[in-house]
A protein has these predicted regions:
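Alpha-helical transmembrane segments and immediately membrane-proximal extracytoplasmic
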Residues: 1-302
């Protein structure tokens, strides 16, 4: 587990698998912590702490987000909230982040410039966005469970499972190239764009390329088909997690909500870029049941 998941996820994403590398990296970090605990014959409590340190360091390193890594471990892995637990986890997060900065530079995963500051009259839209993200996260989790059950029934037919999953994934990517791999480049287009011509670049290399009038339909289809691409990837034998798909769907869902809000003039104007970012935090919160992780992760990713 110290290396197999990293290699498998790299191959999966490299060949277009619509998943993220974060979950395998967390598994690797946890496995390293567990192995260290066994090597030095630590007691069970210390070994669990080392597992948490490995998981948090993995999140902090891959996202360059030390606070999010710390909060993720506290919220998701439910490590004891005491100084004896917090200090080792914080040290591992900061060390992993510094290591990544040294070897990978200080660039952010997502490029975002705040051009429309927060205004109080956008509060109703933000509340409704939260409700929308909650519904989308519920759809994501339920659909994932159904698809996993379907592919589980094909476990006795590995070649049929591989062929069927590959057929679903390749068909979806053919129509919606944004589903290829992690999809972070597509999210960056939505975050950096300021008009339909710039946002329309998300449809490049697709059958809808150059048809900006179909942007809203493209965004909607991608939002609700990403879960099938992710399920087909993992169900057919790929290795990846739902962290990146949650960020991807959240960005597209937030943009879709804001775009529809502005098109139909439901209320005051809301900036699509801001709501795409808030949608990412909303989906992470809904899927992982970790609100603080969503807040700090998005703050540190941009």
């Amino acid at each position: 587990n110290c290396w197999s998941s990293v290699v498998a996820s790299g191959i999966t994403i490299g060949f277009g698998g619509s998943v993220g590398a974060e979950a395998p990296i967390v598994l690797t970090g946890s496995a390293i912590g567990s192995n260290l605990g066994q090597i030095f014959r630590m007691d069970k409590k210390t070994m669990m702490l080392l597992v948490g340190c490995g998981a948090s360091a993995a999140i902090a390193g891959v996202f360059k987000a030390p606070i999010a890594g710390l909060v993720f471990t506290l919220e998701v892995l439910m490590v004891d909230l005491s100084m004896a637990s917090l200090l080792p986890i914080l040290i591992s997060c900061v060390t992993a982040t510094c290591f990544t900065y040294i070897f990978d530079g200080d660039s952010s995963l997502f490029e975002f410039t705040l051009t429309n500051p927060w205004e109080l009259d956008r509060t109703p839209a933000c509340i409704l966005l939260g409700v929308f993200c909650g519904l989308v996260s519920l759809y994501f989790m339920r659909t994932m469970s159904v698809c996993e059950g379907f592919f589980g029934k094909l476990s006795q037919y590995p070649y049929a499972k591989l062929l069927f999953g590959g057929l679903i994934l390749s068909t979806l990517i053919f129509f919606f190239p944004s589903l290829y791999g992690e999809g972070y480049s597509a999210v960056n287009i939505l975050l950096k764009g300021s008009n339909e011509a710039e946002w329309g670049q998300v449809m490049n290399r697709s059958l809808f390329s150059g048809q900006d009038n179909l942007l809203i339909f493209y965004i909607a289809f991608v939002t609700f088909t990403k879960v099938f691409a992710t399920s087909a990837t993992n169900g057919s034998g790929g290795c990846g997690g739902t962290f990146a798909p949650s960020l991807f769907i959240g960005g597209f869902a937030g943009f879709l909500f804001a775009r529809l809000w502005n098109i139909y003039q439901v209320g005051v104007y809301v900036p699509e870029q801001n709501f795409a970012l808030m949608g990412m935090a909303g989906l992470i919160t809904g899927v992982m049941h970790a609100p603080l992780t969503g807040i700090f992760l998005i703050a540190e990713l941009t």
